Amino acid sequence: MNGIVLGSVYALVALGYTLVYGVLSLINFANSEVFMLAAFGSFFAVDLLGLNVADDPIQTGSALIGTMALCLLISVIIGAASAVLVERVAYRPLRKRNSPRLVFLISAIGASFAIAEAVGVWGPKKREEYALTQYVKKNEVFSLFSARVDQTDIIIVVGAFIMAAILVNFVNRSRVGRGIRAVAQDAETAKLMGVNVDQIILITFLVGGIMAGGAAFLYMLNTPFARYDVGFLIGVKAFTAAVLGGIGNIKGALLGGLLLGLIENYGAALFGSNQNIGTMFSFVALVVVLMFRPSGILGQSMSRSRA
């Protein structure tokens, strides 16, 4: 079950990469730090409010629902706000100057390192590990093919599925979603047809930030500790998932995330639960897929597909 749980988190973060790439044909490498800020922001807010239940996790009832709802809301708000700030600072000024694509890449990587190092230097614990809030005790609910499935696993997988379903429905059925697809297909034509391209790009970053914030909340449920650089490895794997599934394709990001989680989990299991071996297997799988299908498994741009 761990593979599906990990894959669900990767898939949500991968959606942020694939949305921005679908609209701008650029990679938002600062998306990993949006994830990190959402995770820590939620943790600190809940801790300051006196709701940190790490020593005595809540199992049921309104206290659990209320704490989780508050933490999810804070994660999503911080994720969305951080992503919008990245767009305003690291992307929009460069777009106004018609800067080369390489400059966007450097700007995004610079923003990513700046955010991570700022938290590492000025955060309450600097570069030490933070004990993250644990909301639900890991009581086994049932076993599936000899795999232990607990309450947290179910919440993460179901939560990721709901968020992904909402996003697909939003992109396919809403007016803003149609605007996103129009800009992804041809920004100049969309602008001539009255679409506010700058606003659509901003909304795309915002939606990607919401996905990263939701992923950060779910990640916190299953992870007891995190550091200032927690977003780096998650971001690299989520980007790998997006490329594996076909970057620019929403369904591809979801498929890539789940596949990557399963490959990583089973790869680690083959060598005595060594997580580093699992990570190696996931990148080997990416190379193999790209050798035979350079565009990824579902390598179709978002503009040509109804996600």
Predicted regions and their residues:
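Extracellular/periplasmic helix-loop junction at the C-terminal end of a transmembrane helix
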Residues: 111-144, 268-276, 298-304
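Pore- or pathway-lining transmembrane helices of multi-pass membrane proteins that form conduits
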Residues: 33-37, 94-120, 230-243, 259, ...
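Membrane-embedded helix boundary and interhelical linker motif in transport proteins
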Residues: 1, 24-26, 30-85, 269-270
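Alpha-helical transmembrane segments within multi-pass membrane transporters and channels
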Residues: 55-111, 255-260, 264
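Membrane-interfacial amphipathic/re-entrant helices at transmembrane-helix boundaries
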Residues: 1-13, 41, 52-71, 97-102, ...
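Helix-loop-helix "hairpin" substructures at the membrane interface of multi-pass membrane proteins
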Residues: 6, 145-226, 250-256
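Transmembrane alpha-helical segments in multi-pass inner-membrane proteins
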Residues: 10, 68-76, 205-212, 218, ...
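Cytosolic-side transmembrane-helix boundaries in multi-pass membrane proteins
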Residues: 107, 127, 185-192, 196-199, ...
